[in-house]
Amino acid sequence: MATNTKYKRDAISIMRDGIKSRYSKDGCCAICGSSEDLELHHYHTISQLIKKFAKELQLDFTDENIVLSNREAFYKKYEHELVRDVVTLCQHHHQLLHKVYTKEPPLFSANKQKAWVQKQKDKIQNPQEKTQVKTETKSGFARFL
């Protein structure tokens, strides 16, 4: 059982390593504008995409040769998620994002992550504006009074 886990990690590393040359980081953090300690964040977690791909095609990703022989098909299928649907963040904001959405955010959370990045940016750009909290909910005719 432990061997499978090891190979699963290796499959993820093999897939990641092959696509890294296609990454393009911006020159500053999308939230704070810092140009130091920049990291690329994938809104669609690579390890989750790899697991999904292997499951859909019923591939045994404990076999390195199978991983390597399917790498280009994986890149082609998920090029948008791997290369384009990403954001450059400073290390601080990248860590904050992962505190909110966990180390391996589920694939369905991509749009929520994008909204979170925008919200953090808005907070920095407009520190005086506070999020309005609805304190009272009226129902029936009371809404019109």
Curated annotation (Swiss-Prot):
EC number: 3.1.21.-
Its biological purpose: Endonuclease responsible for the single-chain interruptions (nicks) located at specific positions in the minus strand of the viral genome.
GO molecular function: DNA binding; endonuclease activity
Keywords: DNA-binding, Endonuclease, Hydrolase, Late protein, Nuclease
Entry's induction text: Expressed in the late phase of the viral replicative cycle.
Name of this chain's protein: Nicking endonuclease
Keyword Magnesium: no
Organism: Escherichia phage T5 (Enterobacteria phage T5)
Upper taxonomic lineage: Viruses, Duplodnaviria, Heunggongvirae, Uroviricota, Caudoviricetes
Enzyme class: hydrolase
Annotated stretches, region: Disordered: 126-145
